A protein has these predicted regions:
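Bacterial Sec-exported substrate-binding components of ABC uptake systems
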Residues: 21-109, 220-248, 370-381
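A short, structured surface patch at a secondary-structure boundary
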Residues: 64-68, 74-160, 166-172
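C-terminal motif of bacterial Sec signal peptides marking the signal peptidase cleavage site
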Residues: 16-20
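Structural recognition of the beta-strand scaffold that forms the well-ordered cores
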Residues: 100-103, 120-124, 166-170, 190-194, ...
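Structured C-terminal subdomain patch of bacterial secreted/periplasmic proteins
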Residues: 198-226, 306-381
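Extracytoplasmic ligand-binding site segments that recognize negatively charged/polar headgroups
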Residues: 99, 106-113, 124-135, 175-178, ...
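Bacterial N-terminal signal peptides that target proteins for export
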Residues: 1-8
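Flexible, glycine-rich surface segments
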Residues: 231, 235-318
Length: 381
């Protein structure tokens, strides 16, 4: 069986190389009469409140055009509908149903779970023990989702054998362009999501509308997002508490890794009523973080009212003693002396649809609220 699959894979790659991207695997049966792209005009667009890195335009016949800023355009074609004639060469065709997805961008999983669309994911770029989302971990344990290799080293045989009809990547794929090219030669379209480039924290959550479009459940996606925003309106409308907050972790080299003032975490602190301690920290690089020598971190953050340790990258801390093992200089910080030091939970990075809860947690620690209500932060003892 493995030899047969490998032979089919080799043949598919050869055909893809001879015929161009997307021709190795035929799309689902098409029954509608062909339409001309030049004759198609948008009828309406998805309303966006915070997101700036994508748009969705609707066309007659159930077609939707997703435009990802500074990246690509994707035409979502309804099941059994024909691909329009004369389609622009840069538009990637995504034929519904998209029900055998290779999900590489781990931050997207939480949005599929929220949409009750886990069954559309067949393959994962994250191993079972790498998931902090219980539903994803259980689906892999049950054999419903198969590990198919990380973004830079996918298992093409497994992916092809699963009749994969979409790969969802993040911009890391551009570090290995040959992988994207190979997937496309197999007839597997690659959707590159850029939610991490959203300037507004809630814009990241709003990408659920993209996946609602891909999966044919836009109304559900829009309601989920609206409910999330409505749930923190009370916090967003409160006056700022005026407390300063640092958000950091200590690297293996002993430096303090902090967020730039333009990063979404810094913005969430502001939305929660706080003031990010490094509110003027910017540079021209695309990175959202900066490594500071401890002396510089001491000078900038020692008087912060609240300290939050980022455990999504480093190990999770439980006590102040564990924090001071990272650097004895931290003992002189105001928040350490007053016992106002907190740590994030490890599952924070993958919990894309819980950013509203993180804003609420930030507000709780900034406004001296009830710590028993916290979901993604805990106090260091």
């Amino acid at each position: 069986m493995r030899r047969i699959t490998a032979w089919c894979l080799s043949a598919a790659l050869l055909l893809g190389g001879l015929s161009g991207c997307g021709t190795a695997r035929q799309s689902t049966a098409q029954t509608q009469a062909a339409v001309s792209w030049s004759d198609m005009q948008p009828t309406d667009s998805v309303d966006l409140e915070y997101a700036e890195c994508f748009s969705v335009d609707h066309y007659d016949g159930g077609y939707s055009l997703i435009t990802v800023k500074d990246d690509a355009r994707y035409l979502v074609v309804p099941e059994n509908a024909s691909v329009p004639d004369g389609l622009d060469a840069d538009i990637v065709v995504l034929q519904q149903p998209l029900d055998s997805i290779y999900l590489v961008s781990s931050s997207v999983m939480d949005q599929f779970v929220a949409l009750d669309a886990l069954d559309s994911i067949a393959l994962s770029g994250t191993k079972q023990d790498g998931w902090y989302i219980d539903e994803a971990k259980q689906a892999m344990a049950d054999g419903k989702i198969t590990y198919a290799g990380k973004y830079s080293a996918p298992d093409y045989e497994t992916i092809y054998s699963a009749d994969c009809n979409l790969a969802i990547e993040n911009t890391m794929i551009y570090h290995t362009p040959e992988v994207k090219e190979q997937l496309e030669k197999l007839g597997i379209p690659v959707f590159v999501e850029r939610s991490s480039y959203e300037p507004h924290a809630l814009g990241r959550m709003e990408w659920i509308k993209v996946y609602g479009t891909l999966l044919g459940c836009e109304d559900k996606a829009e309601k989920l997002f609206a409910d999330k925003v409505d749930g923190i309106v009370d916090i967003l409308q409160k006056p700022a508490a005026g407390k300063t907050v640092s958000f950091f972790y200590i690297t293996s080299n002993g430096a303090a890794n902090v967020r730039k003032s333009t990063d979404y975490i810094a913005e969430m602190i502001s939305l929660a009523g706080g003031k990010y301690i490094f509110d003027d920290l910017t540079d021209d690089t695309a990175k959202s973080t900066v490594n500071m020598q401890m002396e510089s971190f001491y000078a900038g953050a020692k008087d912060a009212d609240v300290m939050i340790y980022n455990a999504t990258i480093d190990s999770e801390l439980q006590t102040l003693d564990q924090l001071l093992e990272k650097s004895s200089l931290l003992a002189d910080f105001k928040a350490v002396k007053t016992g106002n030091v907190w740590c994030t939970e490890k599952n924070l990075y993958q919990s894309t649809m819980e950013l509203d809860e993180l804003i609420r947690d930030f507000h709780t620690v900034i406004a001296d609220g009830d710590p028993s209500t916290l979901k993604y932060l805990h106090k260091l003892s």
